[in-house]
């Protein structure tokens, strides 16, 4: 059919524009997407969790290893995670979205994997645009933009950022070994290329 032929033409003429992150580039390439999904399903133990995070990363331009390190640190990939803070606010779900920061969400939304991933990545992207640095962005995600900008970052946030950085580094290393090494370098040429 015409639709099938168009799909094949699109697939064979896939244009790669580097995002600057191998994980995101591999996810966006139809030839390597399955390997990325396989890798992160193995990390999370859940196809639903892995795919929700990857989709949100793609939409917001977030490096997957950063997003998965954040989700692991926040909830250990548990969509039912819940934490009551000292100030009485409640963090819920995969990305531990705070009820005061996201008042538009209903109770059940916080525990919805797709909603949590979408809002978590939108908020992380907001922090990245302000911070211009992934580790500062993660600090802002945890402690709040104002506290970090005003040099009032709590010690607990510094430990949190360190844990995310270490986990992200492990993910990046494993991704190189388990996924990137399986593919020919010619799949990813930094400028627009037709495959």
Please place each PLM-identified region on the residue numbering.
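Short amphipathic alpha-helical segments that mediate assembly, nucleic-acid/protein binding
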Residues: 4-5
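Catalytic glycan-binding domains that act on GlcNAc-containing polysaccharides
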Residues: 8, 12-195
């Amino acid at each position: 059919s015409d639709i099938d032929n168009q799909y094949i033409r699109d697939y064979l003429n896939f244009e790669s524009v580097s995002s600057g992150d191998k994980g995101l580039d591999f996810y966006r390439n139809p030839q390597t997407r399955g390997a990325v999904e396989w890798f992160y399903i193995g990390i999370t133990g859940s196809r639903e969790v892995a795919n929700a995070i990857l989709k949100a990363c793609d939409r917001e331009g977030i490096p997957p290893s950063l997003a998965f390190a954040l989700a692991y640190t926040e909830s250990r990939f548990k969509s039912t995670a819940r934490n009551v803070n000292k100030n009485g606010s409640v963090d819920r779900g995969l990305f531990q979205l705070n009820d005061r920061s996201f008042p538009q969400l209903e109770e059940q939304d916080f525990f919805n994997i797709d909603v949590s991933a979408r809002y978590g990545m939108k908020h992380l992207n907001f922090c990245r645009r302000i911070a211009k640095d992934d580790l500062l962005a993660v600090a802002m995600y945890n402690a709040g933009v104002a506290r970090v900008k005003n040099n009032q970052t709590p010690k607990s946030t510094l430990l949190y950022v360190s844990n995310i950085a270490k986990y992200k580094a492990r993910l990046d290393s494993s991704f190189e070994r388990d996924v990137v090494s399986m593919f020919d370098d010619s799949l990813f040429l930094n400028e627009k290329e037709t495959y």
